[in-house]
Amino acid sequence: MSKLVTASRLDNVNYDIRGKVQQEANHMIAEGIDVLKLNIGNPAAFQMWAPPHTHDAIREHLQEAEGYSDSRGLLVARQAVADYCVKRKRIEGVTADDVFMGNGVSELIQMTLTALLNKGDEVLIPSPDYPLWTACVILEQGTPVYYACDEESDWNPDIADIRRKITDKTRAIVLINPNNPTGAIYDDEALKEIAQIAREHDLIILSDETYDRVIMDGLPHTSIAALAPDVVTLTFNGLSKSHRLCGYRVGWVVVCGPKEGTEEFREGLYLLASMRLCADRKSVV
């Protein structure tokens, strides 16, 4: 019998936030050591529960979730996301057809990079980073290239460093705003500068906005897609943090900006969504 081993493409893929770090923490807890876990954004672990009406709504409509849906997600859910983008986030022209629902943003990050990257493509990622972005880029045989976020400047992106890191292999810029792990919220001026870089170099912006409704000090949050309607921006969000529903796995990615020229990518994303049949339905009926 041949030995069962992993594929070589996993050789440099790491995700220790849920790997060795968590395993060691669990070992310490088993030995009676008090461990405060700051590595995973899981509100339930801190007794931050979902609003009761969310559970009531799910129970009321649970039977409706027994069958498959459109691979992009239920139309009513996609329309709700589109309305949120247009009315709350001021992103122009978003319709339900621009929305892909997923089993959390994590699944959609991997699906998006699978559809987007060729071997050797470079993706600019903020440092410090949320490690899933690095892991998924490497898994898809891309190359993560890190741009600095300076603590002395309230962890804002170093625009000059972003410009220095661009090559003819650069495909996209990852923006995590509000930022995980630093907590920084980028002002409009920084977002406009990043959008201008994407405009100049024909880059796609991948904007992870998972924490946009978990802002404790009242600062405003702006979606970069609202400031740059002429730039293709994939905007990621979900209910894990805003509604404290991490375990329900409700996320979405919205293809914002010009529709012309994105048709092939949308078809590719639809193909990948179809291969997993559909996202979980019970939380979005």
For the regions a protein language model found, what residue spans apply to each?
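N-terminal small-domain helix-loop-helix segment of the aminotransferase-like
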Residues: L4, D11-G104, M111
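Helix C-cap/helix->beta junction micro-motif
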Residues: E31, E140, E200-H201, V231
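Conserved core segment of the aminotransferase class I/II
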Residues: H55, A226-V285
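Conserved core of the PLP fold type I
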Residues: A65-Q196, R213-L227
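Residue-level marker for buried hydrophobic side chains located in beta-strands
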Residues: N177, I205-L206
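Walker B catalytic acidic pair
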Residues: E209
